[in-house]
A protein has these predicted regions:
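C-terminal and inter-domain tail/linker signature
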Residues: 1-192
C-alpha cells in the first residue's frame, strides 16, 4: 500500500465484539445498579473518563459500556440509555437521514424521544450495532451498522453510521451522527 493511501488517525481504537444474546434481551447487574443509583454511576463514569485513553481498564470498561448502551437502545430500554446522558444533551442526526420537516438538532431527553418516535414510525425494527470505537479522550467516535426494515415498504436498510459522542463529567453532552466517515473524522478534529 502506498504511503498516500494510508490515513493516520489519532486516538485509541477499540474493536467491539457483538453483544451477547443475554445483554441484547435484558439489563445486566451493573446497568440495574446504574439506574438505581445514578449519582454513583456519574461518579464512576467521570473517574473512567479521566483515565488515559490507552489505559487497559478504560478500554475494557468503555467496550462493555458501549455494547451495553447500544443493546439497551436496540431493546428500547430508554432508561438504560439515558443514565449515561446529560439531561441537556444536544443530539444532531445526520442531515441526509432526516426529512426536511424535522429540525436539525434535538435537545434534552424529550428531544431525543421525539426523534426516536420518528425513527420507530419509519422503521419497525431499527437497530444500531457498534463495530469499533475510536477513543479521543473526551470524545468517542463509534462506527455502527444501522439496520432495519421500512414500516410501510418492508425494504431492508443496512448502512454504516458514525456517531461522535462528546463527554463532560462522564456523561454524554452531545451526539452527532454522520453517514460519511471522512465527515465524522473531520468533526472529531482528525482531518483538515
Amino acid at each position: 500500500m502506498s504511503q498516500e493511501n494510508v490515513e493516520v488517525v489519532r486516538g485509541v481504537r477499540i474493536a467491539l465484539s457483538p453483544a451477547s444474546e443475554r445483554a441484547s434481551q435484558r439489563r445486566a447487574l451493573d446497568e440495574r445498579l446504574a439506574i438505581r443509583f445514578p449519582s454513583l454511576y456519574r461518579l464512576l463514569a467521570d473517574a473512567l473518563m479521566r483515565l488515559p485513553p490507552r489505559s487497559r481498564l478504560r478500554r475494557l470498561v468503555l467496550a462493555r459500556r458501549v455494547r451495553q448502551a447500544y443493546a439497551a437502545s436496540n431493546r428500547r430500554d430508554i432508561d438504560a440509555v439515558f443514565v449515561g446522558w446529560d439531561p441537556n444533551i444536544e443530539y444532531r442526526p445526520s442531515e441526509d437521514l432526516m426529512p426536511p420537516d424535522l429540525e436539525g438538532a434535538f435537545h434534552g431527553h424529550d428531544g431525543y424521544l421525539a426523534l426516536w418516535r420518528y425513527w420507530r414510525d419509519a422503521f419497525d425494527d431499527i437497530r444500531w450495532d457498534p463495530e469499533e470505537v475510536l477513543d479521543l479522550g473526551d470524545r468517542l467516535l463509534v462506527e455502527t451498522q444501522q439496520r432495519g426494515h421500512g414500516s410501510g415498504s418492508g425494504v431492508a436498510v443496512s448502512e454504516p453510521v458514525f456517531q461522535l459522542f462528546t463527554f463532560r463529567s462522564g456523561l454524554v453532552i452531545r451526539q452527532e451522527d454522520f453517514r460519511d466517515r471522512a465527515k465524522a473524522l473531520e468533526a472529531a478534529g482528525l482531518r483538515k
